[in-house]
UniProtKB/Swiss-Prot annotation:
InterPro entries: Chorismate_synth (IPR000453), Chorismate_synth_AroC_sf (IPR035904), Chorismate_synthase_CS (IPR020541)
Annotated residues for binding of FMN: R125, S126, S127, N238, A239, G278, K293, P294, T295, S296, S297, R319
GO MF, one example: chorismate synthase activity
Species whose genome carries this gene: Yersinia pseudotuberculosis serotype IB (strain PB1/+)
E.C. number: 4.2.3.5
Database matches in NCBIfam families: aroC (TIGR00033), PRK05382.1 (NF003793)
Gene3D superfamilies: Chorismate synthase AroC (3.60.150.10)
Catalytic activity: 5-O-(1-carboxyvinyl)-3-phosphoshikimate = chorismate + phosphate
Pathway assignment: Metabolic intermediate biosynthesis; chorismate biosynthesis; chorismate from D-erythrose 4-phosphate and phosphoenolpyruvate: step 7/7
Lineage: Bacteria, Pseudomonadati, Pseudomonadota, Gammaproteobacteria, Enterobacterales
BP GO terms, sorted: amino acid biosynthetic process; aromatic amino acid family biosynthetic process; chorismate biosynthetic process
Protein name per its UniProtKB record: Chorismate synthase
Family, per entry: Belongs to the chorismate synthase family.
Length: 361
């Protein structure tokens, strides 16, 4: 089956292309009675949308969301929620030069080989434009998680190129265009972006997402473990080439005596596991990291082929992000929220009556 949906109890199906008429999604499984407005959803969409700073693509989409169904008098009805965002700033002529050429590092070649046809305008369905609907659906999940369980899902830029950012100030994340929590790194990040723009090149990034106050018990061993579903969801984001849960690949150099999260009557003493043990949430913060590749849509000439298999030189023109990782923060938050909400509903369905005498913190 086509891979346009995610989730079992909280199910999100998206549709639309980069230069199509509109983007949309259908959300099934939303409990009734949740207060939700277009303004609630718009808050996260505005964090993701293009053209909001000089560091991102200058495609200027308002990304104004419309609720088509599933909400009446300001609350969810329990029926399918339909959301739509119209595309308003397409410049398809920017892509006419690549109609018969395959951009290296993009999905052009693989989409052509899989489907026998491709929408070359901005990448069509493979464009990160599609993620606007994930953010919209994630905004609903985030509101439910916060209202019902006090769960807070937040993300930040952990690294761009050689510039690493320490988590020093959550409030600062929303006060700069990089989603950076480290004030001392704002100037180096700005310098790096100016250098990239001048060179017509791009850079990769690392994003960290943290969910706090996640209840114990979420996750369905063995194939739908919470970390497995999180990895699946986060890996589905455009340009993501790696996912880590907790300490991730750093555990390779650790010994069991230092990596285990020891438990005392006061609680866990560390969180190397990233809040997930045996595929089930432990009650600690759920922590995930994603690595995003540098976009291949750059002004630096490169080698590729055309439809006839002939060697050609390519320079990608148009409006593109020097670092796609900047706008990935709200997208990663949305995907974590979608997975957590799905698993909360699944846990309630099967194990909602389970009570344990073992302490939880």
């Amino acid at each position: 089956m086509a891979g346009n949906s995610i989730g079992q109890f909280f199910r999100v199906t998206t549709f639309g292309e980069s230069h199509g008429i509109a983007l949309g999604c259908i959300i099934d499984g939303v409990p009734p009675g949740i207060p939700i407005t277009e303004a609630d959803i718009q808050l996260d969409l505005d964090r993701r949308r293009p053209g909001t700073s000089r560091y991102t693509t200058q495609r200027r989409e308002l990304d104004q969301v419309r609720i088509l169904s599933g909400v009446f008098e300001g609350v969810t009805t329990g029926t399918s929620i339909g959301l739509m965002i119209e595309n308003t700033d397409q410049r398809s002529q920017d892509y006419s030069a690549i109609k018969d050429v395959f951009r290296p590092g993009h999905a052009d070649y693989t989409y052509e080989q899989k489907y026998g046809v491709r929408d070359y305008r901005g990448g069509g369905r493979s464009s990160a434009r599609e993620t606007a609907m994930r953010v919209a659906a994630g905004a609903i999940a985030k509101k439910y998680l916060a209202q019902k369980f006090g769960v807070q899902v937040r993300g930040y830029l952990a690294q761009m190129g050689d510039v690493s950012c320490d988590l020093l100030d959550w409030d600062l994340v929303e006060q700069n265009p990089f989603f950076c929590p480290d004030a001392s790194k704002l100037e180096p990040l700005d310098a790096l972006m100016r250098e990239l723009k001048k060179a017509g090149d791009s850079i990769g990034a690392k994003i960290t997402v943290v969910a706090e106050n996640v209840p114990v018990g979420l996750g369905e061993p063995v194939f739908d473990r919470l970390d497995a579903d999180l990895a699946h969801a986060l890996m589905s984001i455009n340009a993501v080439k790696g996912v880590e849960i907790g300490d991730g690949f750093a555990v390779v150099t650790k010994r069991g005596s230092e990596n285990r999260d020891e438990i005392t009557p006061q609680g866990f003493q560390s969180n190397h596991a990233g809040g997930i043990l045996g595929g089930i949430s432990s009650g600690q913060p759920v922590v995930a990291h994603i690595a995003l590749k540098p976009t291949s849509s750059i002004m630096v000439p490169g080698q590729t082929i055309n439809r006839q298999g002939e060697a050609v030189e390519i320079v990608t023109r148009g409006r593109h992000d020097p670092c796609v990782g900047i706008r990935a923060v709200p997208i990663a938050e949305a995907m974590m929220a979608i997975v957590l909400m799905d698993h909360l509903l699944r846990q309630r369905a099967q194990c909602g009556d389970v009570a344990s005498d073992v302490p939880r913190w």
